[in-house]
Structure formats: structure tokens, C-alpha cells
A protein has these predicted regions:
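N-terminal beta1-alpha1-beta2 module of alpha/beta enzyme domains
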Residues: 2-73, 196-197, 220, 286-289, ...
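Short, acidic/polar
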Residues: 32-45, 92-95, 203-213, 230-246
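Acidic (Asp/Glu)-rich catalytic clusters
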Residues: 43-47, 66-75, 96-106, 212-217, ...
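Conserved, mostly hydrophobic/aromatic
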Residues: 45, 49, 69, 99, ...
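Extended, intrinsically disordered, low-complexity segments
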Residues: 130-141, 146, 278-321
Length: 321
């Protein structure tokens, strides 16, 4: 990615060496037929001890469903699985920031690189090959982090007497010229509670997202447990993944394949209890815990860069006056 700025925000700067234990997540497919049940289902899963919910596209946009669930849940993380390729990067980053705001710091991004050949035409583009798809995913992820980092935590001053809402010197541009898109920042949304949202890649999405995204840029790996073939071997799979010395750290264990039209919880409560009894997953989250904290990630630092300051034009004029 080529940018007009010398500084980028990478996973290496924001990720801890390793988590304590991975968070247990349950995947919900956003089927429009289930729209009236999502809130109740999310609350039941939270009560059962799930640490997070992932939202996979089943017809309704995953970010929209996550936004619907944010006010009706209290502690679970919310990670929409959404495309990083055939999107408007600025809008995507802003939507995820907004989700972090309304969930009070419980939002994350399960990065997906779209490979369905019918999708590009819906946004007026031609399909990308595998290598270009991986490059685009990396560019969009890096750009999103620049946008998320474009407001300092103290940028909003709300000086009523002085008629000043924000301090422009505490904003910075996210100017990007990538291979297929360009972006001008800063964000139109103040810095969200987590600053930099956690970005994870599921094993099933690793090939399409590319090795650079999965191994270098993302904050960790998602291990999938498909319950359509039963729960046999689930504990062993989680234990084995935690012992792997090479590759990205497993930060999320995701239960997939639930029949949401029947008994949606099925064996999930028992599986959660068994995994916790063996010390294989993190404890259930408490209210007020950010998703970064749950995943074992440190607080995301702000990266001030004088070259990117939003008031740089005014400063330049003053320097030459």
C-alpha cells in the first residue's frame, strides 16, 4: 500500500505476544427469516456464557445485525464477518467504529475476503484474481486502522463557552493511495472506545485473505468448531490449537453450524461448560470489559504523527507569515 504518510498502524504494534485463553464465540447467520429472534437468541447465548457472537452473512448485512444486538446485550463481543475487498474502505471503517461506540467497546472485525464471482458486478467492479484479492484485503485493513487512529482520545473538547467542539490539532489525516482506491481522512466519527478494533481471520477465510493479512496484520486466528458433525473431538481440537507453537495465536474459538431454526442453543451450553472446566477458554465476560481485553490484547495506543495533523495547512501558513 502506498500512502502519503510515513506511518502505518500494524498488528505488531497492537497485539500482545499471546492471550491467556481464547474466547468462545457462537456464529449467527443473518437469515432474514430469523430477524425477530436475533435479540432473544443473543441474550440466551450471553446468559449461557458465550464470550462473543460472530455474525455471518445470510441475507442481512452482518454489521447491521450486530448494531441491532449491541443495545440488547451487555458483555458479549460482537464481530461481524464482513468483506474487505468489494467495499468502500472509508465507509466500512466508519461503520465498524460506530459499532464500537454503540456497544461500548465490544466490537471487532472478522475479516472476510470475498471470492464469489457474482459479487463484483453488484458494485461495478470486475473480479480480482487471488493475489489481487489478498493485496486488496491488506490495503483495506491497513487503511481502516489509519482511519480508526485519526482522532486522538482527547480530540473532542466540547468547549461551549468558546464555541469549540473539537481540537483540530488532535486530528490527523489518513491519506491513502492504494492500488485500486484512495482515501482521505480523518474519520467523520470520534475515536471509538477501543481505538483500534480487534481484527481476526477464521481458518476458513485464511486462503482468500492471504498470508500477509492472516499471519502479519490480523490480531489473531479464529478456530472453528463445526457442530453439524457433533461435539466429539471439540475439546481435543481446542487443546491442540492452543499448543501450536507456530502461526497466528488462536484468540477466538467459534462454534459454527448451529440449526437456528430448531433448538438454536443445542449443545452449546454443555460445550461451554466442558471447555471452561478444562481451562481451555476464557471466562465469561463481565460488563465493562472491552473485546480487546477479552482477547488478551493490550489497549491500543494512539499514534500521533505531526505530518498528518489535520490543522497542518493552518500551521504551514503561520510558519510562512
Amino acid at each position: 500500500m502506498s500512502t502519503t504518510t510515513p506511518q502505518t498502524v500494524t498488528r505488531a504494534e497492537t497485539a500482545a505476544p499471546g492471550p491467556t485463553r481464547p474466547v468462545l464465540a457462537v456464529d449467527l447467520v443473518t437469515d432474514p427469516a430469523l430477524v425477530g429472534r436475533f435479540a432473544a437468541l443473543a441474550r440466551r447465548l450471553e446468559e449461557a456464557g458465550a464470550g462473543a457472537l460472530t455474525l455471518s452473512d445470510g441475507g442481512l448485512h452482518p454489521i447491521h445485525v450486530a448494531a441491532h444486538l449491541a443495545p440488547v446485550t451487555r458483555a458479549v463481543g460482537l464481530l461481524p464477518r464482513t468483506d474487505a475487498v468489494y467495499v468502500e474502505p472509508f465507509h466500512l471503517a466508519t461503520q465498524l467504529m460506530s459499532l464500537d461506540h454503540i456497544s461500548h467497546g465490544r466490537a471487532g472485525w472478522l475479516l472476510h475476503a470475498q471470492t464469489d464471482p457474482s459479487v463484483p458486478a453488484t458494485v461495478g467492479r470486475s473480479p480480482l484474481d487471488r493475489a489481487a484479492t489478498a493485496r486488496e484485503a491488506a490495503d483495506v485493513l491497513e487503511t481502516s486502522r489509519l482511519i480508526w487512529d485519526s482522532w486522538a482520545p482527547d480530540a473532542v473538547v466540547r468547549d461551549t463557552a468558546g464555541g469549540k467542539y473539537l481540537d483540530a490539532s488532535r486530528l490527523q489525516y489518513a491519506d491513502v493511495e492504494a492500488e485500486t482506491f484512495s482515501v482521505r481522512g480523518p474519520a467523520i466519527t470520534p475515536r471509538s472506545p477501543q481505538g483500534l478494533l480487534p481484527v481476526l481471520v477464521a481458518d476458513a477465510d485464511r486462503a482468500a485473505a492471504g498470508e500477509r493479512v492472516a499471519s502479519e496484520l490480523a490480531d489473531g486466528r479464529v478456530l472453528d468448531l463445526d457442530l453439524r458433525s457433533g461435539t466429539d473431538g471439540a475439546l481435543e481440537a481446542v487443546a491442540a490449537a492452543r499448543e501450536e507453537a507456530d502461526g497466528p495465536v488462536v484468540r477466538l474459538v467459534r462454534v459454527v453450524g448451529l440449526d437456528l431454526g430448531a433448538d438454536p442453543l443445542g449443545p452449546v451450553p454443555e460445550l461451554i461448560d466442558a471447555l471452561r472446566e478444562q481451562g481451555l477458554i476464557a471466562p465469561a465476560p463481565v460488563v465493562g470489559t472491552s473485546l480487546r481485553e477479552q482477547l488478551g490484547l493490550p489497549p491500543a495506543p494512539y499514534h500521533p504523527d505531526p505530518v498528518r495533523r489535520a490543522d497542518r495547512a493552518r500551521l504551514t501558513r503561520e510558519d510562512h507569515s
